[in-house]
From Swiss-Prot:
Involved in the biosynthesis of volatile esters which confer ripe apple fruit flavor. Alcohol acyl transferase that can use a wide range of alcohols as substrate to produce esters. This is Alcohol acyl transferase 2. Keywords: Transferase. Its EC number is 2.3.1.-. Highly expressed in the cortex and skin of ripe fruit. Induction: Slightly induced by ethylene.
Length: 459
């Protein structure tokens, strides 16, 4: 494994990539889902590719991606603009064509030497996605930063940071797919982008018709452990859920839930319970977990165009007092998670938009008693092919304070799910202990299974 002190990343001068052709100069309003306070942050994504001379012999990934970016921005030209804030904090994009930030870099390391260090939480993220001073604001700053780092093995790492108000994971995937298609020679994206953010404006008059526990103001009762403002107190680790862990968890679920619960539901219930125990929250206080639910598709009955790349999700919250969550079997948490997810439909999303307008675009709750989880295992980042084949890893680079992203991961030959978590250092050790306990195989099963029962964590 390459020691951190040895790794050297050399960056060339930062540049602005503008659309390859002139684009409309106009102002475009974001939706009332887009511009909520809780989405006014940057999301880092990392994508790692092996050298593949049989597919792209003698091609320079920096040159190919730079040119494809410029061509894709002709279609996604709002991403080359800058955000402005209007009356009542309403966000709009000044489509001025100023461009996105791009930097070419090289590192004296191979992909093999990096090993698990490319997985979330990526400890080398600051090297592969340098935070240029003044570039990470929300208003008046570039909406996208892309760094392409060439490795000595011929592979490369594409890391990016996107302003979340502009798009969610499916929306970002549409943009990345367009870049990839053009990198492979296409003249236009196979799915043309659609702005139409007015489709998710609030109703007239706005009216809150659903319960939204995710936006409730609450006092932090996590025993003083959780202070998100003190980032030096926070640590990140990732935890792996493979076949063994899922088998043990499923054995704890009542029969009437087994056939209807997903892997995502079960992991979420497990994390919620273990995290609450680790934070030592007052037993009488309410704790919540939110599952990000995509509004696209027929299931939730929200009719959006195929190329819509704005934020189209809500995160309904399951809520419980800490004591029953910690003391009851896992099925208790699982039922609450499933019920919360089931509340998501078009009416729920419309009610969210109305709430955000009526209450001044509030932040979701930001106390330690709240957890937000997002399933990125089927997001499609692993299918983005710039001409070098599929990435060996692609997805969110780390957890973001209260938010954890589930990503696919192959541990040796087994497919599983990797979950990065962010917790105070004192709570992280307790969290790992609780997770190991709840995924521990019974003694009678261990005799039949020689695999380690210790859940794998990655620093």
């Amino acid at each position: 494994m390459m020691p951190f002190s040895v790794l050297q990343v050399k960056r060339l001068q930062l540049e602005l990539i503008t659309p390859a052709k002139p684009t409309l100069q106009e102002a475009k309003f974001l939706s009332d889902i887009d511009d909520q306070e809780g989405l006014r942050f940057q999301v880092p994504v990392i994508m790692c590719y092996k050298d593949n001379p049989s597919l792209n012999k003698n091609c320079n990934p920096v040159k190919v991606i730079r040119e494809a970016l410029s061509r894709a921005l002709v279609y996604y030209y709002p991403l080359a603009g800058r955000l402005k804030e209007g009356p009542n904090r309403k966000l709009m994009v000044d489509c001025n064509g100023e461009g996105i930030l791009f930097v070419e870099a090289s590192a004296d390391v191979t992909l093999e030497q990096l090993g698990d260090k490319i997985l979330p939480p990526c400890p080398l993220l600051e090297e592969f996605l340098f935070n240029f001073p003044g570039s990470d604001g929300i208003i008046g700053c570039p909406l996208l930063l892309v760094q392409v780092t060439c490795l000595t093995c011929g592979g490369f790492i594409l890391a990016l940071r996107v302003n979340h108000t502009m798009c969610d994971a499916p929306g970002l995937l549409l943009f990345l797919t367009a870049i990839a298609e053009m990198a492979r020679g296409a003249h236009a994206p196979s799915i043309l982008p659609v702005w139409e953010r007015e489709l998710l404006f609030s109703r007239d008059p706005p009216r809150i018709t659903c319960a939204h526990h995710e936006y409730e103001d609450v006092i932090d009762h996590s025993d003083g452990l959780y202070a998100s403002s003190n980032q030096s107190n926070m640590v990140q680790r990732s935890f792996y859920f493979g076949a063994k862990e899922m088998r043990v968890l499923r054995k704890q679920i009542p029969p009437h839930l087994i056939s209807t619960c997903s892997t995502f539901d079960l992991i979420t219930a497990c994390l919620w319970k273990c995290r609450t125990l680790a934070l030592n929250i007052n037993p009488k206080e309410a704790v919540r977990v939110s599952c990000i639910v995509n509004a696209r598709g027929k299931h939730n009955n929200v009719r959006l165009p195929l190329g819509y790349y704005g934020n189209a999700f809500a995160f309904p919250a399951a809520i419980s007092k800490a004591e029953p969550l910690c003391k009851n079997p896992l099925g208790y948490a699982l039922e609450l998670v499933k019920k919360a997810k089931a509340t998501m439909n078009e009416e729920y999303l419309r009610s969210v938009a109305d709430l955000l307008v009526l209450r001044g675009r509030p932040q979701y709750s930001s106390t330690g008693s709240y957890l937000i989880v997002s399933d990125n295992t089927r997001a499609g980042f692993g299918d983005v092919n710039f001409g070098w084949g599929q990435p060996v890893f692609a997805g969110p680079a780390k957890a973001l304070d209260l938010i954890s992203f589930y990503v696919q991961h192959k541990n040796n030959t087994e497919d599983g799910i990797l979950v990065p978590m962010c917790l105070p250092s004192s709570a992280m050790e307790r969290f790992q202990q609780e997770l190991e306990r709840i995924t521990q195989e019974p003694k009678e099963d261990i005799c039949n299974n020689l695999r380690s029962t210790r859940i794998m964590s990655m620093m």
